[in-house]
């Protein structure tokens, strides 16, 4: 396995797919990285030379990935909570942040249902 940005990427997959195993690198970013490094997208990771791996590593280092990106996202959320914005309040309460309805669904953010005792008629 080749190590790029502290992540072991799979050897048997194409390079463009293997790069998506790095947090913060999707398919489009992976294509841009390979274009900058001058490596074909169809190449398998096991067929890469050390020179090509080095160029890919340099290209990936220009992007905000892995721990730095996770830290940035968590600090952004913490900042929203501290300034008391609407989005920060939604984060604090564990509710959807982007305007979704919450009457029926939003189970991912709310967690499992908490059943209430039956109301007497």
From Swiss-Prot:
Known partners and oligomeric status: Part of the 30S ribosomal subunit. Forms a loose heterodimer with protein S19. Forms two bridges to the 50S subunit in the 70S ribosome.
Keywords: Ribonucleoprotein, Ribosomal protein, RNA-binding, rRNA-binding, tRNA-binding
Region Disordered: start-end pairs: 92-121
Tagged with keyword Hydrolase: no
Native organism: Oceanobacillus iheyensis (strain DSM 14371 / CIP 107618 / JCM 11309 / KCTC 3954 / HTE831)
Function: Located at the top of the head of the 30S subunit, it contacts several helices of the 16S rRNA. In the 70S ribosome it contacts the 23S rRNA (bridge B1a) and protein L5 of the 50S subunit (bridge B1b), connecting the 2 subunits; these bridges are implicated in subunit movement. Contacts the tRNAs in the A and P-sites.
NCBIfam families: uS13_bact (TIGR03631)
Record-level GO BP terms: translation
One GO MF term: tRNA binding
HAMAP family noted in UniProt: Ribosomal_uS13
Protein name: Small ribosomal subunit protein uS13
Entry coiled-coil feature ranges: none
